[in-house]
Each structure stands twice: as C-alpha cells, then as structure tokens.
Amino acid sequence: MPEAGAIRPDATVLGFDVGSRRIGVAVGTALGAGARAVAVINVHANGPDWVALDRVHKEWRPAGLVVGDPLTLDDKDQPARKRAHAFARELRERYALPVVLIDERSSSVEAAQRFARERADGRKRRRDADALDAMAAAVIVERWLSAPEQATLLP
C-alpha cells in the first residue's frame, strides 16, 4: 500500500529539474507515452517565476509533483540539493499536492544523449540549454514512472 500522500502511479504528474538559473518542467503519466518536456521556468534573484509555474500547473492540472533529488555519487548533501528540497517544499505549499523526490543523478547526461540522438535524426537543430533542462525533467518523470517505489515523499 502506498504511503499516505503518495502519488497514484496512474496520475498525471509534473516533473522538475531544478537549477540555479532555470527549472526544466515535464509532464507524464503511466497511461500515456511516458514523459515529455513542456517548459523551462526562469529563476530570478527572488526565486522561480511563479506566474509561469502557475500557468503550467493550470494547463496540466497534475495530481502530484516529482522533483529531481540531486544526490552526489557518494550520497552527500550539496547546495543544489538544498535548493531542490526548498523548491519542493514551496511547490507543496503553493499547490497542496503530494510532492516526491527521485534520484536525478545523471539525468542531465541522459538528456544530452537524447538531444544528440534527436539532432542526428534531424528532429532538433541546435543544442539549447533550455531544451536540455526540460528534457532532464522528462528523464526524472520517466524514472518515477518506472519505479515510483524508489521515490521519497517530501517530509
């Protein structure tokens, strides 16, 4: 039985790859075709662009939120992890939805490899940091879709 407040595996979710300048956003559902990149949200000195996040939330109406947890290879804490956890808490407070954290190690590398394949196939024209951030968010959602039991419910 899932933890109280956990996200149903068949639910639509928004996933986030949190960076210091941009947040990649993806949408996914187990009933659909995995996950897809949908937006990149700018982060300013005073935090994320909440107006843009509100628009994405309103458009997709997710049942839960999946935030990449940037663990180091030796499972140590780092500033990026603190930033991701703070963002996850803000999401939970703002949208009153369950928020889970999932290991995002190597998600940017996987996103870059996907981008390179799409470029080689002629589906992408040039390397674009925004596209990579959103694609990394799609990788994060796909990890949750394939193994939701490995996610940690935000305390």
From Swiss-Prot:
Gene3D superfamilies in alphabetical order: YqgF/RNase H-like domain (3.30.420.140)
Query: Key word Protease present in the record?
Result: no
Q: Which superkingdom heads the taxonomic lineage of this protein's source? A: Bacteria
Which keywords does this chain's UniProt record carry?
Answer: Cytoplasm, Hydrolase, Nuclease, Ribosome biogenesis
Q: Which GO terms describe its molecular function?
A: nuclease activity
Gene Ontology cellular-component terms for this entry are: cytosol
* Transmembrane intervals: none
List localization entries: Cytoplasm
- What processes in GO biological process is this protein linked to? rRNA 5'-end processing
Which Pfam families would you find in this protein's record? RuvX
- The catalytic activity of this protein is classed by the Enzyme Commission as 3.1.-.-
Q: Which residues lie in coiled coils? A: none
- Family membership: Belongs to the YqgF nuclease family.
- What is the role of the protein in this entry? Could be a nuclease involved in processing of the 5'-end of pre-16S rRNA.
NCBIfam families attached to this UniProt entry? RNAse_H_YqgF
Report the HAMAP family cross-referenced here. Nuclease_YqgF (MF_00651)
Q: What is this protein called?
A: Putative pre-16S rRNA nuclease
Question: Which organism is the protein's source?
Answer: Xanthomonas campestris pv. campestris (strain B100)
